[in-house]
Regions:
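Domain-level signature for soluble enzymes in the chorismate/prephenate branch of the shikimate pathway
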Residues: 1-276
Length: 276
């Protein structure tokens, strides 16, 4: 299996892909848009994309989900353990500047504050590790993955420096073809969809009433403006259950009556860590 990810080798996206899909070929992309493009053009390619973090919230890929409408095959709740990486021989007392992605810096803010370290934002965690490795400067460090330390020959100066020791990022596996697991009443599933409402009073209230009447549990609802306007919005919605469950079917049929556009993005097994 080929899996594309945003960033450079050593990123958390690549780490998650390798841990969940043993033997997969990982391919680095400069942007999230490039990930979506590659997966849209080749059914043998999957994209692994960070969707949200338990501590710092949404990553910001929702517009690309709307734009490309790839199918979601799986979700993975991946433990993010941040590590302070320095050049060989450096000690924490030597460090002045720390480089990483804005979210990694935010998620490790207490460690940075307690050690009087200066946070410097860069595009990604693995890129920060590569930068520190290239400088060979003992006063610089990066916050990145264990994989990054191996790739860029850096020492792990301190492990698990994140504020929340149960720091999790939700990754989505997406691809071109439609696939969904067979319905089993003993399994937990998530149905993901996007929709655009008709322009009428109380449209959202009316559209969502079907979920309440049928006893279906909404677990996510986000709104995003349609391109070039603030008067029309798309909604990204996730429902607890399989689309073949009658109460989910009835809820979506009711929703469709109030929509100009509705598209199911995928049905997939709920990650075992979702309830933790």
């Amino acid at each position: 299996m080929k899996i594309v990810y945003q960033g450079i080798p050593g990123s958390y996206s690549e780490s998650c892909a390798k841990e969940n899909y043993s033997g997969c070929e990982t391919i680095a992309c400069k942007t999230f848009d490039e990930c979506f493009d590659k997966a849209s053009q080749d059914s043998s390619i999957r994209a692994i994309l960070p969707e949200s973090n338990k501590t710092t919230g949404n990553i910001g890929i929702e517009y690309l989900v709307f734009k490309h409408r790839l199918n979601i095959y799986a979700e993975h709740f991946y433990q993010i353990n941040h590590n302070l990486l320095g050049v060989p021989g450096a000690k924490i007392a030597d460090i002045k500047d720390v480089y990483s992605h804005a979210q990694a810096l935010s998620q490790s803010s207490e460690f940075l504050k307690n050690n009087n370290l200066i946070a410097n934002v860069r595009a990604d965690t693995a890129g920060s590790a590569k930068y520190v490795s290239e400088t060979k400067d003992k006063s610089k460090a990066a916050i990145a993955s264990v994989l990054s330390s191996k790739i860029y020959n850096l020492d792990i100066m301190r492990s698990n420096i994140q504020d929340d020791k149960k720091n999790m990022t939700r990754f989505l596996i997406m691809g071109k073809d439609i696939f969904q697991p067979e319905y089993n009443n003993n399994m937990k599933y998530v149905t993901s969809l996007l929709f655009k409402l008709k322009s009428k009073p109380a449209a959202l209230y009316s559209a969502l009433s079907g979920f309440a009447l049928n006893g279906a549990n909404l677990i996510k609802l986000q709104s995003f403006p349609e391109k070039n306007t603030f008067s029309s919005y798309f909604f990204l919605c996730e429902v607890d259950g399989h689309i073949e469950n009658k109460k989910i079917q009835n809820s979506l049929e009711e929703l469709g009556l109030h929509c100009d556009d509705m598209h199911v993005l995928g049905v997939f097994n709920a990650d075992k860590l979702r309830e933790k």
